[in-house]
Swiss-Prot record:
Protein name in UniProt: Large neutral amino acids transporter small subunit 2
Origin species: Oryctolagus cuniculus (Rabbit)
Keywords: Amino-acid transport, Antiport, Cell membrane, Disulfide bond, Membrane, Phosphoprotein, Transmembrane, Transmembrane helix, Transport
Compositionally biased region (Basic residues): 1-10
Source organism, top-level taxon: Eukaryota
Pfam (any one): AA_permease_2
Length: 535
């Protein structure tokens, strides 16, 4: 571990650029060095997007939109419109993904465009709450649908649910640590499984329509309100619809592991988002052919109720489909979130050991173990659902900040290479819709949003003490270096090399925070470079 294995914490050089790609450029599969391998093709890329968007919600409780829309027709319109807005946001992320081709997604874009503090706050809220709680909830949903048939007359024991959820997390963490190819194969298989289950639901809906069972789809009935119309509730329906499409940006977290990202990133987005929109709209239409709006709203597991009504002895397919869907969802979330933490550590925003990969498997084992451990900790707390409510607003806030960064980058750096360059009307449309939902969220739940902001702002002192403050006591640096070395030996990991060439070229010598955002002018650098440096 002599070459590039150890990190020098006590340095005199103070960087001030938007990124560190000169020290840590895109990982490559070429050469013989240790580097992240480009093993994610177009099919696997689509599997990551579709698998992360489609979790258990469309099977279990797609009723949030209908409940707030007030009519079947308006609910279908909400699903279509939110799908279109999601596609617009994905187009914006596609341009950013090929303009700043780094893993880390919106964290990397916000950091490079607006500076280190903004990027750190995005990372902080993701590390602290968003990913651990979401993964814990998905794993608990998986265990609930696996154990429920064993307890037909009562609820499964809570300890059993949490134990099976922990086993699920540990198993998938092992798969992800072992091989990127294994992880993507698991994602492909389980994404295909959930799409087949949804295709069955849609086909059954078509059969119902052919039988004349479309009372609630007739125009006069579709827009028959079962509650008083309210603009606030309609806005809430759009907010629920937007949350249902969450995960559309996850492929941007693994850009460096994509085969030919300049082509496959936008292609995967263009294929996946319309596919998910189609599935969401027609699955909800299918549900309405078998259930009245009141029955749908009263059901705790819509797909299971649908199966009981139409599939007869084959109704067991639906709970199994939910379990398979959530299992794949946990895998996709582990895969992408670990790359976010890897990217954060590479920029000096998290402990440096998280930026290392296994010397043979080329997987970010420390980042995966960190992700798994934080999720296991969430499994033993009873407040994770409350935390999700608090930070959901913050997560949505950063979507808009990232898209706004696209406009800022167009203005400040108009000449940098952009393999994809969309019309600025698209980010403007997305930001208008985003602002509408954001303002409504603040108006309807000011306390929840305020607590979410407070949780995010706890990252400010952490940033200045842990990242911005460079000249820490030598005893502290020595202790951290010792922990890093021990972790390296336990996990058999090193920093990735530049091109798999000489070890000296890939050595990660400095991981200090960079203060100057990408959009700040720097006349000494070439206009096509995204990095800014200050001696």
């Amino acid at each position: 571990m002599e070459k590039g294995a150890r990190h020098r914490h006590n340095t005199d050089k103070n960087h001030a650029g938007g990124s560190e790609s000169e020290d840590f450029p895109e990982a490559s599969s070429g050469g013989g060095g240790v580097a992240l391998k480009k093993e994610i093709g177009l099919v696997s890329a689509c599997g990551i997007i579709v698998g992360n968007i489609i979790g258990s919600g469309i099977f279990v409780s797609p009723k949030g939109v209908l409940e707030n829309a007030g009519s079947v027709g308006l609910a279908v319109i909400v699903w279509i419109v939110t799908g279109l807005i999601t596609a617009v946001g994905a187009l914006c992320y596609a341009e950013l993904g090929v303009t700043i081709p780094k893993s880390g997604g919106d964290y990397s874009y916000v950091k490079d465009i607006f500076g280190g503090l903004a990027g750190f706050l995005r990372l902080w809220i993701a590390v602290l709450v968003i990913y651990p709680t979401n993964q814990a909830v998905i794993a608990l949903t998986f265990s609930n649908y696996v154990l429920q048939p064993l307890f037909p007359t009562c609820f499964p024991p809570d300890s059993g649910l949490r134990l099976l959820a922990a086993i699920c997390l540990l198993l998938l963490t092992w798969v992800n640590c072992s091989s990127v190819r294994w992880a993507t194969r698991v994602q492909d298989i389980f994404t295909a499984g959930k799409l087949l289950a949804l295709a069955l639901i849609i086909i059954m809906g078509v059969v119902q329509i052919c039988k004349g069972e479309y009372f609630w789809l007739e125009p006069k009935n579709a827009f028959d309100n079962f509650q008083e119309p309210d603009i606030g509730l309609i806005a809430l329906a759009f907010l629920q619809g937007s949350f249902a499409y969450g995960g559309w940006n996850f492929l941007n977290y693994v850009t460096e592991e994509l085969v030919d990202p300049y082509k496959n990133l936008p292609r995967a987005i263009f294929i996946s988002i319309p596919l998910v929109t189609f599935v969401y709209v027609f699955a909800n239409v299918a549900y309405i052919t078998a259930m009245s709006p009141q029955e749908l709203l009263a059901s705790n597991a819509v797909a299971v109720t649908f199966g009981e009504k139409l599939l007869g002895v084959m109704a067991w397919i639906m709970p199994i489909s939910v379990a398979l869907s959530t299992f794949g969802g946990v895998n996709g979330s582990l895969f992408t979130s670990s790359r976010l933490f890897f990217a954060g550590a590479r920029e000096g925003h998290l402990p440096s050991v998280l930026a290392m990969i296994h010397v043979k498997r080329c997987t970010p084992i420390p980042a995966l173990l960190f992700t798994c451990l934080s999720t296991l900790l969430m499994l033993v707390t009873s407040d994770m659902y409350t935390l999700i409510n608090y930070v959901g607003f913050i997560n949505y806030l950063f979507y808009g900040v990232t898209v706004a960064g696209q406009i800022v980058l167009r203005w400040k750096k108009p000449d940098i290479p952009r393999p994809i360059k969309i019309n600025l009307l698209f980010p403007i449309i997305y930001l208008l819709f985003w602002a509408f939902l954001l303002i409504f969220s603040l108006w309807s739940e000011p306390v929840v949003c305020g607590i979410g902001l407070a949780i995010m702002l706890t990252g400010v002192p952490v940033y200045f003490l842990g990242v911005y403050w460079q000249h820490k006591p030598k005893c502290f640096n020595d202790f951290i270096e010792l922990l890093t070395l021990v972790s390296q030996k336990m996990c058999v990991v090193v920093y990735p090399e530049v091109d798999g060439g000489s070890g000296t070229e890939g050595t990660r010598e400095d991981m200090e925070e960079q203060q100057q955002p990408i959009c700040q002018p720097s006349p000494g650098k070439d206009k096509d470079s995204l990095e800014q440096s200050q001696p």
